[in-house]
Amino acid sequence: DIVLTQSPASLAVSLGQRATISCKASQSVDYDGDSYMNWYQQKPGQPPKVLIFAASNLESGIPARFSGSGSGTDFTLNIHPVEEEDAATYYCQQSNEDPWTFGSGTKLEIK
């Protein structure tokens, strides 16, 4: 299985500043020119919500302050400017190879 290592496990960011979350895969999640890495946001008591698909594509309805980048094994989620409603846990997920796997999550606190 592909192992996804997220960092940091938690972070606290001041309102209006930038939050950066990294995800490193144990092997490439690229195939035929696309990177099969996705990012999710989960708030307590709610199901995960897709933010970014295929590394850098913004899901419909997601604010443009969320952005994703990377390819191969190294990926980044950026949130800027951070808003209070962004307090949540964020997960990377690869969909290149079965079984699809998730990172362990990053909890974002807004200061």
UniProtKB/Swiss-Prot annotation:
Gene Ontology CC entries for this record: immunoglobulin complex
Domain of life: Eukaryota
Record region (Complementarity-determining-2): 54-60
SUPFAM superfamilies: Immunoglobulin (SSF48726)
Signal peptide per UniProt: none
Native species: Mus musculus (Mouse)
Start and end residues of each stretch annotated as Framework-1: 1-23
Segments of this protein annotated with the region Complementarity-determining-1: 24-38
GO biological process: adaptive immune response; immune response
Positions of the UniProt region annotated as Framework-2: 39-53
Region (Complementarity-determining-3) location: 93-101
Matches recorded under PROSITE patterns: IG_LIKE
Disulfide pattern: C23-C92
Protein name (record): Ig kappa chain V-III region PC 7769
Coiled-coil zones: none
Short name of one Pfam family: V-set
Xref: InterPro entries: Ig-like_dom, Ig-like_dom_sf, Ig-like_fold, Ig_sub, Ig_V-set, IgV_Light_Chain
Keywords of this entry: Adaptive immunity, Disulfide bond, Immunity, Immunoglobulin
Framework-3: annotated segments: 61-92
Segments of this protein annotated with the region Framework-4: 102-111
